[in-house]
């Protein structure tokens, strides 16, 4: 069954708003903005399903129009149930000039014999920002299910003006290869990735320092930060608790969001001054 979700985040009179939305079961979306004076758009992606089932096909399309800012949140942990054929999720996100998209989802819990593949494509133009985070757990650890899923794959591609700048492929097949070996999970049970790309700045060094400072205070994790190119940052974390990693990523996400908001305000003031002159 193909389950569809389409979102268009618009911008009008200095405020981001939900310009258009279409979804089929089990998807739902909710506006979760707390501060009505905040010009950004905050949406929660909700589902009436207990999780992703065998033969499910999720098709998610998100369009961020020029100058619009959207922070998308998930409702809860994403469960991948026992499968024979597998399930697929495709997400396509397009960011126009001076737009922002930020999405750190709750941890994914793959059940025994689950088979899942996600394919994410992000198309960026100039002066836009992307923050996306994902956390993969070992399964239902407290029920004795530790790396008993069949296959988990998450392939992400990021394009800037049509040019591929990042390709990230996470593939876990614990029944075929030992995931606890050196270079894999190394004794940890959770793996997390946070990706930040800003095509409007020349260097993300300050963002890397921000991520390091936040993660250094966390206990019982291993992490590293890489810079694939000047205005891109990828954070990798290994840990043993989904909630810990999720909260750490959310802290980094909020700080990046606030920093960008200040830059946007400064840019708008500069544009107004130039137009006045």
UniProtKB/Swiss-Prot annotation:
The record's annotation in Pfam families points to: UreD
Entry protein name: Urease accessory protein UreD
Record note on quaternary structure: UreD, UreF and UreG form a complex that acts as a GTP-hydrolysis-dependent molecular chaperone, activating the urease apoprotein by helping to assemble the nickel containing metallocenter of UreC. The UreE protein probably delivers the nickel.
PANTHER family annotated for this entry?
Answer: UREASE ACCESSORY PROTEIN D
- What is its biological role? Required for maturation of urease via the functional incorporation of the urease nickel metallocenter.
Recite the UniProt keywords alphabetically.
Answer: Chaperone, Cytoplasm, Nickel insertion
Q: Which InterPro entries match?
A: UreD (IPR002669)
Q: Where in the cell is it found?
A: Cytoplasm
Question: Which family does the record claim for this protein?
Answer: Belongs to the UreD family.
Q: What organism is the protein native to?
A: Flavobacterium johnsoniae (strain ATCC 17061 / DSM 2064 / JCM 8514 / BCRC 14874 / CCUG 350202 / NBRC 14942 / NCIMB 11054 / UW101)
Which superkingdom is the protein from? Bacteria
Offer an example of a GO molecular function term for this protein.
Answer: nickel cation binding
Mention any one GO cellular component term assigned to this protein in its UniProt record.
cytoplasm
